[in-house]
Amino acid sequence: MDPRSEVILRQQDYLKGRVLLINAPNDALVSQLPTEIDASVWTWNYADYQGFLNAGATAHFSVEFPLQEFDQAIIFVPKSKELLNYILHVVMSHLKIDQSVFLVGEKKGGVERAAKQLQSFGKILKLDSARHCQLWHLKIEKTEKIKPLESWLKTYTVQVNEQELTICALPGVFSQTHLDVGTAVLLPYLNQVKSGRIADFGCGAGIISCYLAKANSSNIIHALDIDAFALQSTEMTFSRNGIGSDQLRLQPVTGIADAPTELDAIVSNPPFHQGIHTNYDASEGLCQNAKKHLKASGELWIVANRFLNYPILIEKHFGQCEIKTDLQGFKVLYACA
């Protein structure tokens, strides 16, 4: 069990009524809470959401607070400070004065910094500190009026192959405020991508998806991501750039296995972070299994750190892998099914 969940179980006497667990790890916590606690989970991680459903828990996969009332909330500190700001805001706009909010996180994950953010809503108390984790309690003294989701957007402009794109990114989304180096290295090659049905695996704020849709109005883009905030950001990016929704198919995925088949191309700056931890499972799975989702002569385009052994993985499963460029620490890799 996750050590943060162990802290919650150790201090379960503080819990009562309808309790919302926010960004909780996918473990046995919910099933081990006392039966008199009516626990629900709000997550934006699709793999965790599927895990909670399979375990019989009440779970919500969304970027917005669940549409019901709660007596308490437990916030598992996210990696992003901006995302925590958003979560605190929506919690304080849905819960009431004198209700309890708990904050739990790893010390290396910034729980002490997060506790300081909590202070602006009332008096806080540290309830537990063990297993490199801390648990804080807040009795709400100040609530907030809900702001529209759009007010949390960050936007920036990207110029590529004579196209200008406006990128919209919500809190917690990869490269929320600027174009990342890996995608910047990949973008000049997108005009070579085969037209048709194209999947953007790990779509993030929708930079790759938006370019491919704008480059050819007949392209159908399957924007795939594990994160609800990324999918919502991609939809907002398409809208901001005047691209019709008929070109976009948004799909939450746990990995490449959930992707459509018979695709003309898969393009990806693959994800490798899971919270504060590094996890290459999704990107390695993409290299190993992408061919199953492509038509004959379909294309795989990936940008990745040069130190990763993806060319070897791709060559093993495709029979070949071409390195299109090696620039600023990133390689653009190409293979044909």
Curated annotation (Swiss-Prot):
Its EC number is 2.1.1.172. One of its GO terms (molecular function) is 16S rRNA (guanine(1207)-N(2))-methyltransferase activity. CDD domains: AdoMet_MTases (cd02440). Keywords: Cytoplasm, Methyltransferase, rRNA processing, S-adenosyl-L-methionine, Transferase. It is found in: Cytoplasm. It comes from the Bacteria. It catalyses: guanosine(1207) in 16S rRNA + S-adenosyl-L-methionine = N(2)-methylguanosine(1207) in 16S rRNA + S-adenosyl-L-homocysteine + H(+). Pfam families: MTS, MTS_N. This is Ribosomal RNA small subunit methyltransferase C. The lineage of its organism: Bacteria, Pseudomonadati, Pseudomonadota, Gammaproteobacteria, Moraxellales.
